Curated annotation (Swiss-Prot):
The lineage of its organism: Bacteria, Pseudomonadati, Pseudomonadota, Gammaproteobacteria, Enterobacterales. It catalyses: propanoate + ATP = propanoyl phosphate + ADP. ATP binds at residues 11, 18, 175, 203-207, 278-280, 326-330. It comes from Escherichia coli O157:H7. Its cofactor is Mg(2+). Disulfide bonds: none annotated. This is Propionate kinase. Pfam families: Acetate_kinase (PF00871).
Amino acid sequence: MNEFPVVLVINCGSSSIKFSVLDASDCEVLMSGIADGINSENAFLSVNGGEPAPLAHHSYEGALKAIAFELEKRNLNDSVALIGHRIAHGGSIFTESAIITDEVIDNIRRVSPLAPLHNYANLSGIESAQQLFPGVTQVAVFDTSFHQTMAPEAYLYGLPWKYYEELGVRRYGFHGTSHRYVSLRAHSLLNLAEDDSGLVVAHLGNGASICAVRNGQSVDTSMGMTPLEGLMMGTRSGDVDFGAMSWVASQTNQSLGDLERVVNKESGLLGISGLSSDLRVLEKAWHEGHERAQLAIKTFVHRIARHIAGHAASLRRLDGIIFTGGIGENSSLIRRLVMEHLAVLGVEIDTEMNNRSNSFGERIVSSENARVICAVIPTNEEKMIALDAIHLGKVNAPAEFA
């Protein structure tokens, strides 16, 4: 066993690899970076926020070799005791994280048609890491597995049964690693018993989802079979009437593929504002009186509040509403507008606490008189993945979750 073991966390996207190296004893981040533009001539690697360096080899394997070389330069290569992989979709097969074996790889491949853009990239990352770090225990952490505790009435669609039985058409949910980490932290921050609690977690970023967590388990979530369902997002429409899209197709002669591009890439904040999918740009425009930017933000907020209230119905009681993700953690405007919408639930805002920057970390942003506590908890998916790897790999597990 390594004297000073570290965990390498790998997140292979459709054209990028994000990575972090964490100390196995306390999960402190020792280095991090991103390889982007994979499989293109513009592929580059940036480490610890430094200047991007062109990659000599543009494949996933080439990018991971470059990452391994960066570890070697810092004398960390031989310290890698565990590797944790973020896997986009585990289907109904994976209800929890798993040590990677040939059988696990085969099962990931089986469910990959459910998330072809990401799962096949995840598999490339696993295969390359096995070659670069032979003998190192690797762990798969699935974005969907936290939601496998949902009851059938929460995950089934009102479609003919054969589509579920034969094709696996159902709600799977995403952002599970984030929702799990944040709900665990919330129990500590709000002094709640994990086995007797009710939380609604709002992961708000360019992709966004809501999760109802009852007694530490996901019982409902807004994303569906794909990450398109639920909230309006940066470029995704979120919930939309299928009949409306069918009518658009009939009027414009667009194909299913065309419309899929529209609802995934051209809608949401970008679609309504006509300006940007970046909330920071839209907030600036909001204050400058840009009407469509204001309308985009109001629609975004309305959908968030409606989904939070709806997800509360899946709980026996509502102890807290937790904001996380890039927008949830950093936008005091969005939090304020959402909380104002939720006055019906007994939510009251503490303006001073809400206006504090994210550098303050975990914090309660509701007033002392509020019936429901609202809090901000920065997510840390890399730490959650590392903790799962440490737990399964039994390498000097940290004494405390925090």
